[in-house]
């Protein structure tokens, strides 16, 4: 008899509190955790927390990397950060700590832990985001219904959505006219990179449209460490991170954004070419 079957057979006769304290029943009891969202994707987690969460909201979900690995998705001010949670078979590992049971793991979150990453941003985990939320059973009635196009088929239905892929943190930026370096707060959402005077500023100094960016790469011309640049037709922006790891993270996510943008543009061009061929 397997471990899961054994646990299932004992579930009705044992006190649930005893099961929560067991080291071998961790993943089976995750289903009873109200803020465990199962196989929720990274994209869906970001959309959920950004649209309906608040600073300090978090949820636990399956990681798509390997069995026994989970992702803790946390809402910061303007982004969602993801952290690994590992189940070893007898304990949960998160951050610098290891918990011998799910009960101890959850108790840690009940005490509102403070965590920080390479960005230097500190977050207090205050608000577990529930898997189930009450919703009204209200539907709209269709009053107008017609087709705006003709001659299209199911092949024209290509689901597309911009990747959220959020990130935020302080970077040191070189000025445009006066080549001095100033520390600014940067946020990345969808295809926009914004920078602010500081983290508390309500309005950005500038918004950069990444659809106009042609390249992101490490830079060694400014005689500064952890420096990288964004190339636009009108200007090259030079940015420096505090650490090499942080610079690498910014470069990776920005390059990933550019690859997605180019892919969407290529798909759009292919669609236009195929339609022009049909109507020739």
UniProtKB/Swiss-Prot annotation:
Residues 35-129 form the SH2 domain. The modification Phosphoserine is found at residue 141. It comes from the Eukaryota. The keyword S-adenosyl-L-methionine does not apply. GO terms for cellular component: cytoplasm; plasma membrane. Phosphorylated on tyrosine residues. Induction: Upon B-cell activation. It is a peripheral membrane protein. InterPro entries: DAPP1_SH2, PH-like_dom_sf, PH_domain, PI-Interact_SigTrans_Reg, SH2, SH2_dom_sf. The keyword Cytoplasm applies. Coiled coil: none annotated. Keywords: Cytoplasm, Membrane, Phosphoprotein, SH2 domain. The modification Phosphotyrosine is found at residue 139. Residues 164-259 form the PH domain. One of its GO terms (molecular function) is phosphatidylinositol-3,4-bisphosphate binding. It is found in: Cytoplasm; Membrane. Interacts with PtdIns(3,4,5)P3 and PLCG2. May act as a B-cell-associated adapter that regulates B-cell antigen receptor (BCR)-signaling downstream of PI3K. This is Dual adapter for phosphotyrosine and 3-phosphotyrosine and 3-phosphoinositide. It comes from Mus musculus (Mouse).
């Amino acid at each position: 008899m397997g471990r899961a079957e054994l646990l299932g057979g004992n579930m009705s006769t044992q006190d649930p509190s005893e099961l929560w304290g067991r080291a071998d029943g961790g993943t089976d009891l995750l289903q009873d955790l109200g803020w465990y969202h199962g196989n929720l994707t990274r994209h869906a987690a970001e959309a959920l927390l950004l649209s309906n969460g608040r600073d300090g909201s978090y949820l636990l979900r399956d990681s798509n990397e390997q069995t026994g690995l989970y992702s803790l998705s946390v809402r910061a001010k303007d982004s969602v950060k993801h952290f690994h949670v590992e189940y070893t078979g007898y304990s949960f590992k998160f951050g610098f700590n290891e918990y011998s049971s799910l009960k101890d793991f959850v108790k840690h979150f009940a005490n509102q832990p403070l965590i920080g990453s390479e960005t230097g941003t500190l977050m207090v985990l205050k608000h577990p985001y529930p898997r189930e939320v009450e919703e009204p059973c209200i539907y709209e009635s269709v009053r107008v219904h017609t087709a705006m196009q003709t001659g299209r088929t199911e092949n024209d239905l290509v689901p597309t959505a911009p990747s959220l892929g959020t990130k935020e943190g302080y970077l040191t930026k070189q000025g445009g006219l006066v080549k001095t370096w100033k520390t600014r707060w940067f946020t990345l959402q969808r295809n926009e990179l914004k920078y602010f005077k500081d983290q508390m500023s309500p309005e950005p100094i500038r918004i950069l449209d990444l659809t106009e960016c042609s390249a992101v790469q490490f830079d060694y011309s400014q005689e500064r460490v952890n420096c990288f640049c964004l190339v636009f037709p009108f200007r090259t922006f030079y940015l420096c991170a505090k650490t090499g790891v942080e610079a690498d993270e910014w470069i990776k996510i920005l390059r990933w954004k550019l690859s997605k943008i180019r892919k969407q543009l290529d798909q759009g061009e292919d669609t236009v070419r195929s339609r022009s061929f049909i109507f020739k």
